[in-house]
């Protein structure tokens, strides 16, 4: 190894070690939908928060796969928390089989959309990381337009908990 190669290798190693790492979003969403229990690990690349510390918008995405690592069940859950009072919650659940969505359920805050409620048990902000935990409850129904209009004629109950530590969206 020449001096120049050695110096370059040392410089590259220094910069690799000196580059700050990004914290990973962690947590899970545990739901009971129509009497069936599900636990969804948070998808760290799709979960974050934005806004101010006293008025955050929180967006969580989570997925669970079957034992073969296929046919995911996907949850998207979001809400605002102005002065740490949850509002405007939205919950979406999609179950895939053989690459096709076989079940899609939606819920939101208004009574005609499932009366989804969020209760915050804890919250804290440390630099760009937000930690929250709480529970949700409501009804879920189907929709032909991705949750804009939710049909509750065959609604199913949903309840559960969430715990998450997520990074602020840049």
Where are these regions (language model features)?
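Generic hydrophobic-segment detector
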Residues: 6, 25, 124-128
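A generic alpha-helix preference that emphasizes hydrophobic side chains
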Residues: 18-20, 131
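Bacterial N-terminal signal peptides that target proteins for export
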Residues: 1-9
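Short, solvent-exposed mixed-charge patches
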Residues: 169-170
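An ectodomain-focused feature that recognizes extracytoplasmic/extracellular
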Residues: 23-113
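A broad, structure-centric signal for solvent-exposed, well-ordered loop/edge residues
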Residues: 8-10, 40, 49, 127, ...
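Acidic, glycine-rich flexible loop segments
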Residues: 95-164
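Bacterial N-terminal signal peptides
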Residues: 9-18
